[in-house]
Amino acid sequence: MNRLQVLAVASLALLSGLAPQLCAQDFEALAKDVAQELAGRQYDKVEARFDATMASAMPLEKLQTFWDATAAQVGALKTVKSARSVETQGYHVVTLACDFEKAPLNLRLVFDKDGKVAGFFLVPPEAAWNPPDYANPSAFHEEHVTIGAEPWQLPGTLTEPIGAGPFPAVVLVQGSGPNDEDESVGSNKPFKDLAWGLASRGIIVLRYEKRTHKYAAQYKKEMGNLTVKEEVIDDARAAVALLAGRPEVQKARTFVLGHSLGGMLAPRIAEGDNQIAGIIIMAGSTRPFGQIVVEQIKYLASLSGPVGDGAKPQIGAAEKFAQDYDSPSLKLGDTVSMMGIPLPAAYVLDLRSYDPAATAARLTIPMLVLQGESDYQVTRKDLEGWEKALAGHKNVTIKTYPGLCHLFIPAGNPPSPADYDKPSHVARGTLDDIANWVAAQRTP
């Protein structure tokens, strides 16, 4: 499954809330009907179930493009094994555990009170999380905190070492999509791994629910004006400000760790914020987003052998996205279709105007750049952007990790989306390097 595509769907299929009138069993039955229609490629029937916002965001052609791209990666939907539902913000969210030909995936559908589909996306199946062996739960405690101000306050968790402080601190910033505070992907929780592992080494860690996860309903109406400032940057800086007011946090030793999109944006978060003592970039991209999407789609298509006619529509759609993404005529109010998923022009134009490597080069704070050598999403080409821009900086450390994928967990051979479905943990070597680097950054 194309994880970039899944994250985009999760990011853009945002929900709104009204009181439900149907019962849980009704919504589960509706969800199974939708799954059956998708499996049968009855796209017109699926589209007829959409609410007005969903119908506008994913019309028939885009729905077909999305589902065909899914089938190209994981095969046809074979069976629905189980269904579970939960009410959230007045909507009913139904998760169907599905078996596709090549991999299990959960189909998650969101219904309004009238049974209309307000959003849907595919996610890896969940499994129980167990602590990594480098975490020592007796060495720390956790406290629930609130980040930011109304109307966008976010729940977070402060993982704090036991003992006499003050301690250095790290803020964790997630990648694309509406992530929870653990940046959960299936049974993997890389941010929980980092929080527990670093706190076991004497470092305070703050992680929090992403705004587009907590306030999905509100942001459905705000998507046309959404940029990474609202999605990521404002809340990361609010988290830094919260730590600055905590007596157990050592002054001038608060760091920002960003992963994926968070890594790409880490220099922008730090620029102009003198409370940030340094940044850690994990799998942060430096190249244009459209270029990365094309490269990724071609790679995923190649996993099944020589690229045949079946993959050409998906590759063509990716290339069309890259062309539209870079279009000089793109203006506010427009949308760009990414494999059937509409991205608002405000979001695209904001990303286009940002050069992560050049921004990093303007910083004088210490930086740690980490890259998995088996990452097919953010690759060696992106790392070269950091290396070139930061070549003259003596306070920059760059490390790569053989055999690790985008989540800094072991990758398969060849690396594939299936790697994210296997329960694992952020590699000990990566955790050790982060902890040692933070410990080495002393106040002037």
Predicted regions and their residues:
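Accessory cap/linker subdomain of secreted extracellular hydrolases
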Residues: 278-362, 392
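Catalytic active-site module of serine/aspartate enzymes centered on a nucleophile-bearing elbow/loop
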Residues: 404-407, 412-444
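N-terminal cap/lid segment of alpha/beta-hydrolase-fold proteins
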Residues: 127-165
